Amino acid sequence: MLQRDVFVDQLKGYACLLVLLGHVLLGLISCGLSLPAFLPFSERFIMSFHIDLFMFLAGYVYHLTGDAASKGSRLRFIGNKLLNLGLPYFFFSAVYIAINSLTPGVNTASSLSDILQLWRQPVAQYWFLFSLFWLFVFWALLSRFFNNITITAVLFTVFTVLKYLNIDLGFLDSSMHCVLAFGLGTCLRSLAVQKLPAAARIAAILLPILIVSALFLT
């Protein structure tokens, strides 16, 4: 039996807290209140990586649990993800749209007809389930021909080129935005930080700080 990785569970918990904090800050900022200067920066900082952290962990667990072969066949794996991700996605999205369409004064109005577009146009926070499902489909299909490193490189290259050419990715846009984070997770064999060289641990701490500082403090 595969032993549960407690560190991954802890990281998921931290990521959930970051999502909650980020959206609380976003709500405060959007209200137009007079706020300390560091709050908008804090919100942008959190939003810059919290979803990527979730996708990275999803990719890591995908690889840790045996990739697409874990269910016996790729088709069975995709069917399993359709049940585990697709059903909650359609159910809760439909409930969200129904309530939103019947409630006056909401920030983002919905129509009941939007339910018919859920197969290609996710709503609200449920885009995460939609994107994650398609990432699993990408990896399940491509893993027949390539390893995880190659899949990550190919998909990220395709995404970068299409974005550079300003080509619309349609309903796959949100998934393609997450291929690098998810793919890096699939390429990692272990999250045991103590096994990494000291230089790698230092770089893992300093590099994100330097990148974020360059993006938001200049």
Report the location of each language-model feature.
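Interfacial loop-to-helix transition and helix-capping segments at the boundaries
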Residues: L39-I51, L116-F130, Y164-G183, L215-T218
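Transmembrane alpha-helical segments and their boundary/interface "anchor" motifs
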Residues: R44-L53, T65-N100, N107-A124, S131, ...
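Functionally critical transmembrane alpha-helices in membrane proteins and complexes, commonly lining
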Residues: V6-G66, L85-S93
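Specific transmembrane alpha-helix
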Residues: I51-L64, F130-L141, L165-P197
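Membrane-interface helix-boundary motifs at transmembrane edges
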Residues: L2-D5, D67-G79, A140-T150, R189-R201
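Small-polar-interrupted transmembrane alpha-helices in polytopic inner-membrane proteins
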Residues: T150-K163, I205-V212
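C-terminal TM-helix exit segments that contain a strictly Trp-centered aromatic cap at the helix terminus
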Residues: G22, F92-P104, V212-L217
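Alpha-helical transmembrane segments and terminal signal-anchor/GPI-anchor hydrophobic tails
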Residues: P197-T218
